[in-house]
Amino acid sequence: HSALGHRYSLLTRLWPSNPFSRRYLQTRDDREGVRDADWVSGAALVHRREVGERLGGLDPQFFMYCEDVDFCYRARQAGWRTRYLPLVTVRHDIGGSAERVKPAMIRARHQSLWKYYRKHFRRNPVKDAVTYAGIFGRSAWLLLYDRLGGRRVK
């Protein structure tokens, strides 16, 4: 679901209040109470020592992106829960003031998305091909847009 409602997806841009986007983006109305979450940002990830030891920590194959998503997914597969705590606020400023995202970061993000997909979901050749085309087609578009002097892209 999060791929459909991701902050930068076409669906979110055309219909911001759709159920997929609302679930992924968690609008202010959705931030009431402690509850389960699919994943939390690595900047806000706190876990029991036992979880890190059993899972082996963050997977080093992921650079900059998806390491937190992967960790939370593996934790869920092992029987643990990821919880959202509204009383905690974490601010992550790295890259926030940059006018444009560097091409290396665009590539790293999309390579990590593909690695994550391959690690956990690769099963069907048709679905794999469509997913690959979607991830790297988007990457190519963002790199071209950036190269042509587009505004900040993600």
Each PLM stretch: what is its role?
Residues 64-65, 106:
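Short, conserved glycine- and acidic-residue-centered signature motifs
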Residues 1, 5, 59, 66, ...:
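Residues at alpha-helix boundaries and short interhelical turns
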Residues 70-152:
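Active-site-adjacent helix/loop segment of glycosyltransferases
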Residues 4-25, 130-154:
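Membrane-proximal basic amphipathic "stem/tether" segments
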Residues 1-55:
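Acidic/His-rich active-site region of diverse nucleotide-sugar glycosyltransferases
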Residues 35-37, 43-45, 49-63, 69-91:
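Catalytic donor-sugar/metal-binding loop of nucleotide-sugar-dependent glycosyltransferases
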